[in-house]
């Protein structure tokens, strides 16, 4: 997570929680001159479109006042979905036994992309079983990870 993303999480979490939701995570994606801030919210009863609209208004008001992003950007607020991104250690713990795909920041075992079953989680590492091989991957080396939805 970048410094900007960390600052945004700290800034937005209280407002999201005040609405009764949990800030699952966020990502700031830049593609040339176009940027998108994606904020994922959760609730044990699920998230509706109205919930996303309420959270979007609250988040937008905070961002307008604090102005942490200097360039133009689009704000998207949604539930994490069935193929949810994994941001925090407890997300990985909840996903144990699930199939996940991930990309590491630095190459590991000669590659950066992995897909397999998440079989163990510790405070700083996960174990991923892929094609009969177990890979120990530091949480700090994971750039992006998500659950693979099964239908």
Swiss-Prot record:
InterPro entries linked: Ribosome_maturation_RimP (IPR003728), RimP_C (IPR028998), RimP_C_sf (IPR036847), RimP_N (IPR028989), RimP_N_sf (IPR035956)
Cellular localization per UniProt: Cytoplasm
Source species, domain of life: Bacteria
Keywords tagged on the record: Cytoplasm, Ribosome biogenesis
UniProt record, GO biological process: ribosomal small subunit assembly; translation
Gene3D superfamilies, per database record: Ribosome maturation factor RimP, C-terminal domain (2.30.30.180), RimP-like superfamily, N-terminal (3.30.300.70)
GO cellular component: cytosol
Pfam annotation, one family: RimP_N
Entry similarity comment: Belongs to the RimP family.
HAMAP family found in the cross-reference section: RimP (MF_01077)
Listed name of the protein: Ribosome maturation factor RimP
Lineage: Bacteria, Pseudomonadati, Pseudomonadota, Gammaproteobacteria, Alteromonadales
Gene giving rise to this polypeptide: rimP
